[in-house]
Amino acid sequence: MSGKIGLYTGSFDPVTNGHMDMIKRASHLFEHVYVGIFNNPNKQSFFTFELRAQMLREAVCALPNVTVVSAEHGLAVDLARELSVTHLIRGLRNTADFDYEAGLEYFNHRLAPDIETIYLMANHDLQPISSSRIRELIAFRAPITGLVPQAVINQVEKMNENNKKI
């Protein structure tokens, strides 16, 4: 395990308990784990980039070998090189995720052949959870307890109290 540094990336819009499970498990496999928060150019964000980063930082604060890094734009492999990462960490919930990730891995390997990609299977109980489903629940003010970290719940409650559009 010595010298192994992982990078787990996503838009985390918002961070879910599925993401947190991946981050916690990766923190046991690597000396250090960076969690890179990106904007997805193919999606309209629900939460601002700053709020997503804040909620993610609060969610991982108890994990001493995990650091959140903001990389609003760019490629994960570029951030990985900048941070001297040895492994990209990807989570898989189902075969659709696998097909998508296999395509990404091909290009990541072409751009950075020295950085390995590893896949962690999602915990069975967390497989149905996705940020897009959470956003739907939030939009309808449905309960999200047990699906997301407390930092997300706190932010949603705060915004609901102020009747702000998220």
Curated annotation (Swiss-Prot):
It catalyses: (R)-4'-phosphopantetheine + ATP + H(+) = 3'-dephospho-CoA + diphosphate. GO terms for cellular component: cytoplasm. This is Phosphopantetheine adenylyltransferase. Its cofactor is Mg(2+). Substrate binds at S11, K43, A76, R90. Pathway: Cofactor biosynthesis; coenzyme A biosynthesis; CoA from (R)-pantothenate: step 4/5. It is an enzyme of class 2 (transferase). Reversibly transfers an adenylyl group from ATP to 4'-phosphopantetheine, yielding dephospho-CoA (dPCoA) and pyrophosphate. InterPro entries: Cyt_trans-like, PPAT, Rossmann-like_a/b/a_fold. Homohexamer. The record marks H19 as: Transition state stabilizer. The keyword RNA-binding does not apply. Pfam families: CTP_transf_like. GO terms for biological process: coenzyme A biosynthetic process. GO terms for molecular function: ATP binding; pantetheine-phosphate adenylyltransferase activity. Keywords: ATP-binding, Coenzyme A biosynthesis, Cytoplasm, Magnesium, Nucleotide-binding, Nucleotidyltransferase, Transferase. ATP binds at S11, F12, H19, G91, L92, R93, E101, L126, Q127, P128, I129, S130, S131, S132. It comes from the Bacteria. It is found in: Cytoplasm. HAMAP family: PPAT_bact (MF_00151). Belongs to the bacterial CoaD family. It comes from Streptococcus equi subsp. zooepidemicus (strain MGCS10565). CDD domains: PPAT (cd02163). Its EC number is 2.7.7.3.
